[in-house]
């Protein structure tokens, strides 16, 4: 699994490696959540390449399934995505999810890390 553990002052988070596929299917997602549990990390930093392409097509249901699994296990997720992916229906979805505290999309890793470190 191409991930690392980052320990902050109050929280640890799992960081996906930019440029590497990480979650290709539901089994990979469960493995990632299990890895979080093993390392006492309740947060995840992901990049576009870490997510399946279907994640960005809302009609596939993949985004809903992925985010619901993270929510069920109380894992907070920050995703660093290029602006080119955050458009259309997926862009509207991002606007809605960014209002909550479970999943947010950022254009810079620094912003994502700040959000993960908060609270």
Residue ranges and their predicted role:
Residues 2-119:
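Amphipathic, Lys/Arg-enriched alpha-helical "gate/interface" segment within cytosolic domains
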